Amino acid sequence: MKNFAAIDFETANQQRTSVCSVGIVIVRDGEIVDSYYSLIKPEPEYYSYWNTRVHGLTMEDTMNARVFPEVWAEIQPKIEGLPLVAHNSPFDEGCLKSVFQMYQMDYPDYEFYCTCRASRRKLGSLLPNHQLQTVAAYCGYDLTQHHNALADAEACAWIARELL
């Protein structure tokens, strides 16, 4: 795949609507040409212990962040016409659909591809698992900031260029 937008969301709690950060990496002609990161005020606005433990974000980090529709207004023109790629895409696609619905925004029916599924299909038992950091390392990307939305989106972009 040569043209796409890799996307990753982190959530504040178990609710798919609680996106608290987003990372986007734009790939055109096989090259990373743009990236975007933003904190987002989650809805509902509370952080579960487990989610914070995973990504390190807290209520203080997003206290003055913009709400999703404001952030998406900046992202949408960047990804116009591009398929979206995520590692474990059902999660990220589910977040996107849920937050669009919650804010009563028209969902553009984005085309999603999953690098986790592609890894399972193409690499199978070559890898001990198909977690993002494992597959990224196999594809030559050193994911040192796992669960930072931008770092995860960049790792996903590296994987997609190799496997999709």
Placement of each model-derived feature along the sequence:
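Conserved non-catalytic scaffold segment of RNase H-like nuclease domains
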Residues: M1-D109, S125, N129-H147
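Short, glycine/acidic-enriched loop or turn micro-motifs at the edges of active sites
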Residues: T11-N13, R117, A155
